[in-house]
Design a protein with these regions (language model features):
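Hydrophobic membrane-insertion alpha-helices, especially the h-region
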Residues: 8-25
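Aromatic-capped interface at the extracytoplasmic side
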Residues: 23-36
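Extracytoplasmic
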Residues: 37-39, 55, 104-108, 131-135, ...
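Early exported N-terminus immediately downstream of N-terminal targeting peptides
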Residues: 38-89
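Soluble periplasmic/extracytoplasmic beta-strand elements of cell-envelope proteins
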Residues: 39-45, 108-112, 135-139, 149-151, ...
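Amphipathic, coiled-coil-like alpha-helical scaffolding segments used for oligomerization/assembly
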Residues: 78-118
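Acidic/histidine-rich
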Residues: 98-101, 109-137, 143
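Soluble extracytoplasmic domains of inner/organellar membrane proteins
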Residues: 126-185
């Protein structure tokens, strides 16, 4: 009898925990789902993990950010940023290819806009939730090396930390901004990812 009572109590506690978690996750997950609608990301894949190829990846990054900084700084929306990239994909690819040649390599390169899954990622004072994001992706050579990423719009990766915060605050809703700048939010992101795998 006591055993049955204990089992019932344990089951009740588990159900209560699951329901409480779901009620807290659902609104949080809704805010997470909105963030990709306001963010345009930048993703570079190096040829390999050799020191030389990783150094080349960073040189390509610096060159692309240098050449596009003003335009991304003046974009008024994610759509503006994405349209700029679409209209200039060939130019961006040429910038990348020239930087690769300049450094003594003959790797082919590709610049494209993709909608891809990113895991939960940290960037300076930001944590972005996992999800499907639109991004400018640049691949160098075999694209088998470690990647580099940042946020092109709002232009966090080409700003100082304070400037990036100001731009993010202008673009994101109050709930979204609070979520990505909360340094205690990672556990909730993990719960959301688990929730998405089970129910989505």
């Amino acid at each position: 009898m006591k055993t049955n009572k204990s089992i019932l109590l344990i089951k009740s506690a588990i159900i209560a925990f699951v329901l409480t978690t779901l009620y807290s996750v659902i609104p949080f997950q809704a805010v997470c789902a909105e963030i990709p609608n306001n963010v345009f990301r930048f993703h570079i894949l190096a040829n390999s993990d050799s020191e030389e190829d990783q150094t080349l990846k960073l040189k390509v990054r610096d060159k692309v950010l240098e050449r596009t900084k003003i335009l991304f700084d003046t974009a008024n929306s994610k759509s503006d940023a994405e349209e700029f990239v679409k209209a200039n994909l060939e130019t961006i690819e040429e910038i990348v290819q020239n930087e690769v040649y300049k450094n003594g390599y003959n790797y082919p390169v590709k610049a494209e806009i993709v909608n891809m899954h990113f895991d939960t990622r940290h960037y300076e004072s930001y944590t972005l939730p996992a999800g499907m994001y639109d991004a400018l992706r640049i691949t160098i050579g075999n694209a088998k090396g470690h990647n580099w990423w940042c946020v092109m719009y709002p232009s966090i990766c080409i700003s100082t930390a304070d400037e990036g915060k100001d731009r993010a605050k202008d673009v994101l809703s109050d709930d979204e901004y609070s979520l990505v700048t909360d340094d205690k939010v990672e556990y909730k992101f993990f719960i959301v990812e688990l929730f998405q795998k089970i129910f989505v």
